[in-house]
From Swiss-Prot:
One of its GO terms (cellular component) is cytosol. It comes from Lactobacillus delbrueckii subsp. bulgaricus (strain ATCC BAA-365 / Lb-18). One of its GO terms (biological process) is protein transport by the Sec complex. It is an enzyme of class 7 (translocase). Keywords: ATP-binding, Cell membrane, Cytoplasm, Membrane, Nucleotide-binding, Protein transport, Translocase, Translocation, Transport. Its main location: membrane. This is Protein translocase subunit SecA. Belongs to the SecA family. ATP binds at Q85, G103, E104, G105, K106, T107, D504. Part of the Sec protein translocase complex. Interacts with the SecYEG preprotein conducting channel. Has a central role in coupling the hydrolysis of ATP to the transfer of proteins into and across the cell membrane, serving as an ATP-driven molecular motor driving the stepwise translocation of polypeptide chains across the membrane. The keyword Magnesium does not apply. It is a peripheral membrane protein. It catalyses: ATP + H2O + cellular proteinSide 1 = ADP + phosphate + cellular proteinSide 2. Its EC number is 7.4.2.8.
């Protein structure tokens, strides 16, 4: 282990040495840039752009571009980046993480790589954790980029698509991580290309990168809508299908008569309306053509009502308990609590059984931050604390963590932890130290891990008449103002972990002489990184400072991992005195080893999440790419549509003509052709079910499709309208099936753990089942596109 750490440390040093040489080059241009007039310095931007067009790379331009950005910062912002900030900027440009201590000027560091990468014209996204920081940085740093001739945009959730499109078209765009992810998902739900807002994802610099890529990595971004089903539609469809009669006649295509309204094919558990059933549906719902594009949702409700009433069996497939429909596991016979059939089938069964139909919001699109940010051409980030998660950044995001040296030596005092037997004795000691330091005017920042702890401490300070501010990470703008004053003489501030992050605490007059900012931690967090963030609030830019953590045996982390060893150790030293305190490096080491265990567990969980998510990621990319192809098409989608219809014909004909001719399911084949491809008249006059061969029938049906396509082209007359019709058909079907598939995959994932009991690897099972479900969905999409396209009657009022 020591060898590995040594290697990593040396790799860090080697990388920094390389950066030092580049920083020398940047600094060598300083005098030259300082000698230029404002106009000459501003003229560098178009000069760099034309050099890029002629083939120079961004790496070639780096020393000069960084020097230009640096000189412009001095003139516009009154700030001149230090050498260590140049090193940080190089790390960011290289697609790595620059670990820079609090107060070392991360925002200014980012200006150099942002300027350099924006010259390419492909867009740079500067990502922050909340909209207050995004808008603050866009206002402050935007002046610099605009002065240099770049365009700057701010992307926030309240904007219209038009405003967002403008923001994304800028050279530099400030945004939050969540808004970027949601915009990506929304872009892949549009029906016209002009509705999209994002450009291809080029380069992102993430501020507080550990918070976004580690702490929130597993948070899925979800866009959901009211599941399209109106409950009344399920009831209407249910009432209709309950009146229908099954056609139980044998598979004999010679008999043209329907003997019922629907037919069940038990080997495949499929059910479909016969011609009589289709006519009854048209009469019942007052329609001319059931399979018209406009009636797609109704057809879906009827299909599910048929399955619910005639294929799903009560007490075998499901049970009704306390007015609820519960699924029965077909393998174990057990009731599966909390699970629901997908694709509206559950609601259809609820309608069948007359119980309350549960509203469901349906996930229309979803992605995790891990998968969203991995799509950028180049990704980089800044934070004060990333080294502890170095392995995760390297393995998952292919980013190295480069620790950037501080501009001035750190002289802060980090004291050993103090351990108390109980929470009460610990908080009493915290208040005593606050009183003592407050009395001499030293500013104090107290970190807590929960709102409950903050309120407890606040109450105790009120009793002691010590004025203080409490931050709970709710109001970002107000909290930034409070945090900015937390370094003033006499200030006492209580903050939960994330509150006020991103805002520096600057020391007020006379505070250095009092020992700088005192930071008191009231509990160790399960992640060392969060503790380090709290410590890093003090001692910025070489200022004096003091930090100390107070622990008790009743703290969550100590209860989970400190165990009996620490308790025995404490008992031996404290003689059962509740107020007895132990100050020991051994305790600190014990706590840190507990934290390492938790971090390891959390990393394994995130890694596993990613492995599961990768299954969905691959499927999402396929669907979004196909969707984009449809949206992008300017001429005709015949080349997309025809193969889909041909594959459907092949699949259906093969399915119904397996084995010996005597076992062919001719009735089912005939029903498919009538309900999805042709009129009854055509089937009766043109297809001879006694003598046909499967291959000859396929060719005949291909020709039928070609003729139908040409008829529609002629009816629409305008190629643009034909293209619009094709897009309507494909996008409607794809979107509906994809939404249902997301739901089904989610249900699969929730149930897959149970398969682990059968000595099966749950991940492999999920991959296999997920792949099969995806293939099935593609087949269903092609089937529905076939039926919708072939059966649609052309009218000129298409709406997507």
């Amino acid at each position: 282990m020591a060898n590995i750490l040594k290697k990593l440390y040396n790799a860090d040093k080697r990388e920094l040495k390389r950066f030092e040489k580049i920083a020398d080059q940047v600094e060598s241009y300083a005098d030259q840039m300082a000698a230029l007039s404002d106009e000459e310095l501003q003229a560098k931007t178009p000069e760099f752009r034309s050099r890029i067009e002629k083939g120079e790379s961004l790496d070639d331009l780096l020393p000069e571009a960084f020097a230009v950005s640096r000189e412009a910062s001095k003139r516009v912002l009154g700030l001149y980046p230090f050498r260590v900030q140049i090193l940080g900027g190089i790390a960011l440009h290289r697609g790595n993480i620059a670990e820079m201590m609090t107060g070392e000027g991360k925002t200014l560091t980012a200006t150099m790589p942002v300027y350099l990468n924006a010259l390419s014209g492909k867009g740079v996204h500067v990502v922050t954790v909340n909209e207050y920081l995004a808008s603050r940085d866009e206002t402050e740093m935007g002046q610099l980029y605009r002065w240099l001739g770049l365009t700057v945009g701010l992307n926030v959730s309240t904007m219209s698509p038009e405003e967002k499109r403008k923001a994304y078209a800028c050279d530099v765009t400030y945004s939050t991580n969540s808004e970027l992810g949601f915009d990506y998902l929304r872009d892949n739900m549009v029906v016209y290309k002009e509705q999209m807002v994002q450009r291809p994802l080029n380069y992102a610099i993430i501020d507080e990168v550990d918070s976004i890529l580690i702490d929130e990595a597993r948070t899925p971004l979800i866009i959901s809508g009211e599941a399209e089903q109106a409950n009344a539609d399920y009831v209407r469809a249910d009432r209709f299908v309950k009146k229908l009669v099954e056609d139980k006649s044998d598979n004999d295509a010679d008999d043209d008569e329907d003997h019922g309204d629907y037919k069940i094919d038990w080997p495949t558990k499929t059910i479909s309306l016969t011609r009589t059933g289709i006519q009854k549906a048209c009469d019942h719902f007052g329609l001319k053509n059931l399979y018209d594009v406009e009636n797609q949702k109704l057809v879906h409700h009827i299909d599910q009502a048929l399955r619910a009433n005639y294929i799903m069996l009560k007490d075998i497939d499901y049970v009704v308990q306390d007015g609820e429909v519960l699924i029965v596991d077909s393998f174990t016979g057990r009731v599966m609590e909390g699970r629901r059939f997908s694709d509206g089938l559950h609601q259809a069964i609820e309608a069948k059984e007359g119980v309350k139909i549960q509203e469901e919001s349906q996930t229309q699109a979803t992605i995790t931050y891990q998968n969203y940010f991995r799509m950028y051409q180049k990704l980089s980030g800044m934070t004060g604390t990333a080294k502890t998660e170095e392995e995760e950044f390297r393995e998952i995001y292919n980013m190295e963590v480069i620790t950037i040296p501080t501009n001035r030596p750190v002289i802060r005092q980090d004291m050993p932890d103090l351990l108390y037997p109980t929470l009460d004795s610990k908080f009493k000691a915290v208040v005593d130290e606050i009183k003592e330091r407050h009395a001499k005017g030293q500013p104090i920042l107290v970190g807590t891990v929960s709102i409950e702890s903050s309120e407890r401490l606040s109450h105790m300070l009120d009793k002691e008449h010590i004025p203080h501010a409490v931050l709970n990470a709710k109001n970002h703008a107000k909290e930034a103002a409070i945090i900015m004053n937390a370094g003033q003489r006499g200030a006492v501030t209580i903050a939960t972990n994330m509150a006020g992050r991103g805002t520096d605490i600057k020391l007020g007059p006379g505070v250095k002489e009092l020992g700088g900012l005192a930071v008191i931690g009231t509990e160790r967090h399960e992640s060392r990184r969060i503790d380090n963030q709290l410590r890093g609030r003090s001692g910025r830019q070489g200022d004096p400072g003091y930090t100390r953590f107070y622990l008790s045996l009743e703290d969550d982390l100590m209860k989970r991992f400190g165990g009996d060893r620490v308790k025995d150790f404490l008992d031996r030293l404290s003689d059962n005195d509740d107020d007895k305190v132990i100050e020991s490096r051994l305790i600190t080491r014990q706590v840190e080893s507990a934290q390492k265990r938790v971090e390891g567990n959390n990393y394994d969980t995130r890694k596993q999440t990613l492995q599961y998510d990768d299954v969905m990621r691959i499927q999402r990319e396929i669907i979004y790419k196909e969707r984009m192809q449809v949206i992008d098409e300017q001429q005709s989608l015949k080349s997309v549509l025809m193969p889909m219809i041909h594959r459907t014909i092949d699949h259906q004909v093969d399915m119904f003509t397996q084995g010996d001719r005597s076992t062919w399911r001719l009735d089912s084949l005939r029903d498919f052709i009538v309900s999805s491809l042709a009129s009854e008249e055509y089937v009766d006059s043109e297809i001879d079910f006694k003598t046909f061969t499967p291959d000859a029938l396929k060719q005949q049906l291909y020709q039928l499709v070609e003729d139908n396509y040409q008829e529609k082209e002629a009816a629409l007359a305008d190629p643009e309208q034909m293209l619009e019709f094709e897009k309507v058909v494909i996008l409607r079907v794809v979107d509906e099936h994809w939404t249902n598939h997301i739901d089904a995959m989610d249900q699969l994932r929730q149930s897959i753990g149970l398969r682990g009991y059968g000595q099966l690897n749950p991940l492999v099972e999920y991959q296999d089942s997920g792949y099969n479900m995806f293939e099935e969905m593609i087949s269903d999409i092609e089937f529905d596109v076939t039926r919708l396209f072939m059966k649609a009657q052309i009218r000129n009022n298409l709406s997507r």
